[in-house]
A protein has these predicted regions:
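Extracytoplasmic gate region of multi-pass secondary transporters
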Residues: 2-47, 51-54
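Loop-to-transmembrane helix entry/capping segments in MFS-fold secondary transporters
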Residues: 36-37, 124-134
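Helix-to-loop junctions at the C-terminal end of transmembrane segments
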Residues: 54-67, 153-154
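Structural signature of the two symmetry-related core transmembrane helices
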Residues: 70-85
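Multi-pass alpha-helical transporter architecture, strongest
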Residues: 87-88, 164-192
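Hydrophobic core of transmembrane alpha-helices in multi-pass small-molecule transporters
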Residues: 94-109
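Intracellular juxtamembrane helix-capping segments at the cytosolic ends
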Residues: 109-122
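A membrane-interface helix-boundary motif in multi-pass transporters
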Residues: 151-168
């Protein structure tokens, strides 16, 4: 059912967030030799950009209410590309920090549409059960990500940790599009 797709979306997208929150400071220090203060400022900028993106994303969600899955997919694709660029090592520390903070903006813009996507996937009368199930994907993603990507960090694969996060985010894009497709099919069946 579509609820499991929603769970998978939250699981995968949160794995990427956990990488940023848990490892980005260490990655920036190891790859780009930036100071601890600059690296933590980048994490703060990421969070503030995500909050600003959420604000902007509210306008985007109201402008494209029928295409929430596509808005989410577009924002997450952009964020994945930015995260992969940051992990590539092609740029100096300052530019890498700006790119990582911009990733937060892209993810934030998709946030309100993400919530609308979940709302559309929820059958009538099942809101509490669905939201409880779906949002538990956040906890599972946060718990799983350090186990997987901590191994990368331990081996010194700092850039690959971010590139791996970008790949996981692209998987969440595919799942978001699957949620939209299944929600539409579920709606058509209910209308018959």
């Amino acid at each position: 059912p579509v609820v499991w797709w929603c769970f998978a979306f939250f699981f995968l997208s949160t794995m990427t967030l956990a990488i940023v929150q848990t490892f980005s400071v260490s990655i920036l220090q190891a790859m780009h030799h930036v100071s601890f203060e600059a690296a933590t400022l980048t994490l703060t900028a990421y969070m503030l950009c995500a909050a600003a993106g959420m604000f902007l994303g509210g306008f985007v969600a109201s402008r494209f209410p029928l295409r929430s899955d596509r808005v989410v997919a577009s924002c997450m694709t952009l964020a994945a590309l930015l995260m992969a660029l940051c992990g590539s090592g092609w740029f100096n520390g300052t530019f890498a920090m700006v790119i990582l903070a911009s990733t937060g903006l892209a993810i934030g813009v998709g946030g309100p549409s993400r919530d609308m996507m979940i709302k559309k996937a929820t059958p009538k009368g099942a809101t509490g059960r669905v939201y409880g199930m779906v949002y538990s994907g956040l906890d599972v993603g946060f718990a799983t990500s350090p186990l997987v990507f901590g191994v990368f960090m331990d081996r010194g694969w700092y850039g690959l940790t971010l590139v791996g996060g970008a790949c996981v985010m692209l998987l969440s894009v595919m799942v978001a599009l699957g949620v939209g497709k299944r929600s539409q099919a579920q709606k058509l069946v209910a209308e018959r």
